[in-house]
């Protein structure tokens, strides 16, 4: 679906495929390709908070992102802008819930971090909304976002498995400590 433009894409494609297909039985090349591309995109920290407020500042809170997606009562200037922000919310929720589940722990929630349930709800809902943009230039992508919404929890689990595997590899590759 996406073109391979990022140097980490082959690595992430294989890691996602191993996790999603090999461990979870989720055999959907469009989903695995999309998630691999998402990992590449969010490997650049500035992309994690690409939604901007009216003053151009990054929007870092989930509730504020959701408000920014509203074309009637929020900051979205059009339905295309709503789709773009909702797509980002789905991506953000999937990434944070799968790769940084500790961010949803209660002590972090006191600092306005969303719970895992909040991320799942926002991610599923956002991908569903994106899937409803199913005309014209969005017609081909709409079914992918419907599948991402339907399998959101499995996609989170797949990312958590990737995270765990990467952590294991890192510990195996570290040089022995110097005394």
Describe each PLM feature range.
Residues 176-179:
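Helix-rich, well-folded core regions that mediate interactions or catalysis
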């Amino acid at each position: 679906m996406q073109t391979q433009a990022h140097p980490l894409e082959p690595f992430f494609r294989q890691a996602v495929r191993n996790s999603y297909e090999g461990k979870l039985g989720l055999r959907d090349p469009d989903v695995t390709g999309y998630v691999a591309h998402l990992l590449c995109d969010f490997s650049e920290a500035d992309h994690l908070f690409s939604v901007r407020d009216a003053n151009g500042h990054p929007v870092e809170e989930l509730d504020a992102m959701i408000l920014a997606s509203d074309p009637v009562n929020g900051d979205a200037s059009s339905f295309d802008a709503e789709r773009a922000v909702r797509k980002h919310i789905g991506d953000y929720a999937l990434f944070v819930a799968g790769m940084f589940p500790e961010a949803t722990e209660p002590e972090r929630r006191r600092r306005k971090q969303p719970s895992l349930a909040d991320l799942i709800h926002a991610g599923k809902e956002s991908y569903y909304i994106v899937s409803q943009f199913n005309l014209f230039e969005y017609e081909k992508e709409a079914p992918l976002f419907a599948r991402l919404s339907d399998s959101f929890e499995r996609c989170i689990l797949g990312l958590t498995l990737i995270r765990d595997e990467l952590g294991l590899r890192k510990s195996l590759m570290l040089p022995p400590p110097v005394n």
